[in-house]
Amino acid sequence: MKIAVVYWSGTGNTEAMAQAVAEGAKNAGGDVSLLTSADFGASDMDTYDAVPFGCPAMGSEELEDGEFGPMFSDCEKKLSGKKIALFGSYGWGDGEWLRTWEDTCRSDGAVLACESVMCNEAPDDEGLDACRKLGAALLS
């Protein structure tokens, strides 16, 4: 199964999460590509069986809108029936950005493979383990 782990990271926290997601998917037998949002677009969606997306909360609990947001908006038309998962880090708030993002994906018809993973600031061992499990869940 081909998996693209697509993420944007400003501080390295979401990047660390993305690496753990990729590790979990590889260990479960996936053919994994780790890509930044600058290197992925809607035209790539059909190449992959599953796409976990990672983005931190920005501003008032929103997706990063300079690079990740436009890429994700472009991909939305390809989400119907696609197996995906969501992850990201935050520094304040309660994770509203992730719940809103999940609702958007469900409205687009995406199949959420598992519960989303969010970490406050840098992921700890428990957070990284949750990311590995998220990666593995994409193959089940």
Map each language-model feature to its residues.
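Aromatic-flanked redox-active Cys/Sec active sites in thiol-based oxidoreductases
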Residues: 7-11
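FMN-binding flavodoxin-like domain, especially the glycine-rich phosphate-binding loop
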Residues: 2-3, 13-16, 20-37, 42-140
